[in-house]
């Protein structure tokens, strides 16, 4: 729960980086909506303020992920005029694949993974991951990076909805309240 809540502090870093690097500040009246969305995700993810050294390390990694996601978002927005969407996405995904290839090669064991598992991983990489990130980058070209990033926080709400539809899981009252708070926060920013 910590990592999910911390990773979705990314809208804060996107908003700060957009103002700093892109000279696209967020009006002060909209900061409350950003904070409300982040708080809603924390409630939705059932954030519990517990602590241990191991949890602190994981929390630090999650914070690094949030900052990196923020910088990725701002970098994508900054390149909107320089490259067409699919050219930009192709370079980003190609370089990411090259970066991950050594780790994948070291840990690949053909005796463990059959062709069905490999096809499933490739399919997940191309369809939901590739299409989702390409649509996210398309949104970054059209709206303030914070707006696109706030909508991305709804991955968590989408996961809850999929849990209801596919697994019959009933969300807790705090999950429902958290999802509603995120939607109100997004509404305050966008409207």
Language-model-detected regions and their locations in the chain:
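Hydrophobic transmembrane alpha-helices of multi-pass small-molecule transport proteins
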Residues: 16-17, 26-47, 100, 122, ...
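Membrane-interface helix termini and inter-helical loops of multi-pass transporters
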Residues: 45-57, 104-121, 164, 168-173
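Structural signature of hydrophobic alpha-helical transmembrane segments
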Residues: 1-10, 55-68, 116-129, 180-182
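Hydrophobic/aromatic residues within transmembrane alpha-helices
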Residues: 20-22, 26, 79, 88, ...
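Helix-helix packing/entry segments at the starts of transmembrane helices
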Residues: 3-9, 75-97, 129-165
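Hydrophobic core positions of alpha-helical segments in small-molecule transporters
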Residues: 6-9, 29-32, 57, 64, ...
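Hydrophobic residues within membrane-embedded alpha-helical segments of Major Facilitator Superfamily
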Residues: 13, 36, 42-43, 61, ...
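Transmembrane alpha-helical segments that form core, pore/gating elements
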Residues: 14-16, 34, 50-108, 121, ...
């Amino acid at each position: 729960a910590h990592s999910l809540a911390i990773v979705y502090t990314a809208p804060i870093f996107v908003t700060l980086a957009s103002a700093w690097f892109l000279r696209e500040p967020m009006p002060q009246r909209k900061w409350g909506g950003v904070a409300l969305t982040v708080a809603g995700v924390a409630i939705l993810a059932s954030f519990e303020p517990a602590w241990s050294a191991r949890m602190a390390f994981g929390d630090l990694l999650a914070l690094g992920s949030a900052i990196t996601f923020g910088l990725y978002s701002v970098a994508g927005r900054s390149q909107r005029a320089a490259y067409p969407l699919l050219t930009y996405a192709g370079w980003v995904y190609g370089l990411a694949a090259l970066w991950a290839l050594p780790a994948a090669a070291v840990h690949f064991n053909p005796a463990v993974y059959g062709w069905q598992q490999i096809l499933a991983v490739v399919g997940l990489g191309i369809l939901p991951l590739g299409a989702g990130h390409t649509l996210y980058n398309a949104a970054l070209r059209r709206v303030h990076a914070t707006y696109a990033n706030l909508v991305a926080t709804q991955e968590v709400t989408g996961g809850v909805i999929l849990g209801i539809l596919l697994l019959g899981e009933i969300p807790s009252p705090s999950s429902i309240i958290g999802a509603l708070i995120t939607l109100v926060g997004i509404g305050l920013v966008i409207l």
